[in-house]
Every structure is written in C-alpha cells, then in structure tokens.
Amino acid sequence: LIKDCVEKFINKYNLTGTFIVAFSGGYDSMCLLDVLSKISDDIVAVHLNHNWRGEESRLEEQNCREFANHANIKYYTETLSDDIEKTETAAREARYEFLKKCAKKFHSNIVFTAHNYDDNAETVLYRIIKGTGTIGLQGILEHRDIFYRPLLKTSRTEIEKYIKDNNLSPNIDSSNSNQKYKRNFIRHKIIPLLQEINPNVKDALNSL
C-alpha cells in the first residue's frame, strides 16, 4: 500500500511538524497529498501556477484549490511571473525557489515532492544520454536539504490505481504529451523502444 510506504518513509526520517506538499494537481502530487492527509493534519498544499496555458492553467489551479478545501487542507498559491523564460530548466528553478519560499513562510523544513519510480528511471536515462558520472547515475535523491520524495519506490501504474480506487480527479496537463520537451520524448518514445529489448528496463535504470 502506498500509505504504508509513505508512513515508513516519514518514520525513517523522523519527520514531524508542518509538511509542505508541492501540489500541481496531477496524478502524482494528488496521490501524495491525499495519502499525507490521512497521516497528518499539519499540511500545506502549495501550487505554483505557471500560467503558460491560459485558461487550462487557471482551471488546474481551481481544481487544486477545490481539492484542498474539500479535504480541509491549508492551501497556498502564486502565479509565475510572465518574464520567466518558458523552458523546462527555468520552470524547474522557479518551482524550487517557490517551494523554498513556502517553507520559510510556513516555518517548515520539510517539503514533499511527488517524484516516482518511473520519473527516476527517466531521469537516469536522460543523464546517461547527456553524459554523466557515477553521481548522476544515482538518479533522484529521496532526501536532499529540505526536500523529501516518498514516492520514489512507487510506480506510475500504482499511483494511477490509487487515484482510480479513491475516485480522485487530478489535473491532466496537456503539455505532458508534447514531445518537444525532452523528458516527454524519453517517456513516450525512448522508454517504450528500450522495453522491446528489456521489458524491465525501468527496474534496470532504477538499480544503477
């Protein structure tokens, strides 16, 4: 069970106090937020509206707000400045700055992000393609500084099952299917080709 995995993770790091949860409203972060809400009542869901997709971005933020309100979870949002460069790297940097700011605002040193098993496989592969040393092969760290990632051993399939079983309604980001973004290209094109050689390629990448 995902809840058991998250509880073990929290106990492993002896995490107490206010939990900040990076909440895009997608499958992964909605799953994580829902699980955490069953474990702790001291949670703040924080959402950064990139505002790159106009009305779609607005509706995603609205869905996040409504989910948090319905679950009685404290909610905070900001909208990304228009002058931020519209690239994956710039967006990632802006998100992490936002999360650090939220940690200070709510007097917390614990920020949860919902990176999962599949994300880690894709990250390792991306680093191999770009060229990396042994440190890069470690993939996404489950803990670094104030950031904690309790879903790294949970697959995307398990998360989708949790969402379905609990009748949750996550945001479906249309840009996730846009293969001009390198990570989407890896997810939708390269990984499936590698699975023809090794159906367990995600396990292989996670084991590096």
Model-derived segments and spans:
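Core alpha/beta nucleotide-donor-binding catalytic domains of modification enzymes
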Residues: 1-191
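An accessory alpha-helical subdomain
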Residues: 91, 193-208
